[in-house]
Amino acid sequence: MSLDLRIEQQQKSLWCWVAVSVSVKRFYTTATIHQCEQASSQNDGKPCCDDPDACNVKDGYLMAALQRLGVFRQLVEDSVPFELLAAEIAQKRPVCCRIEWRDRTGHFVCIDGYDGRALFVKDPWDGAFLRVPYDEFKTRYRGSGRWTHTYLTTP
């Protein structure tokens, strides 16, 4: 089962949170929100559309970004059971996840479907659609990523 969420590729190296939040909003509505506009809203109104490099900061918070766009429902500070993911997808709600790399930096992705126990992961880093076994996604996403937080969304 797949929701066919179209993930935007992040326009700056640290804008995974921007691309994920904008992609989820676009999944639920026809609203057009540019990544630089969303980045500006989280950077004290800096003109990110005029100078995106000045806004390429790592303190972007996905929860606040989803809240600002009206599509945030709940934060779980951990991974969640496969059955919860399946239930969210069945309700046509993509699930966002924070991945932590070995160097303790983070990255955000979206899950928009599954087949058996394999998850359909949309990654804004390169716009990739990846089919990743659930157990691998929890502890070894792209080799070394560990799933640390789950963001449930709502229309």
What positions do the PLM features span?
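A short glycine/serine-rich beta->alpha loop
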Residues: 2-11
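Long non-globular sequence segments
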Residues: 6, 28-31
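Disulfide-stabilized extracellular ectodomain repeats and their linkers
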Residues: 13, 33, 45-46
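N-terminal carbohydrate-binding/catalytic regions of secreted carbohydrate-active enzymes
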Residues: 20, 24, 28
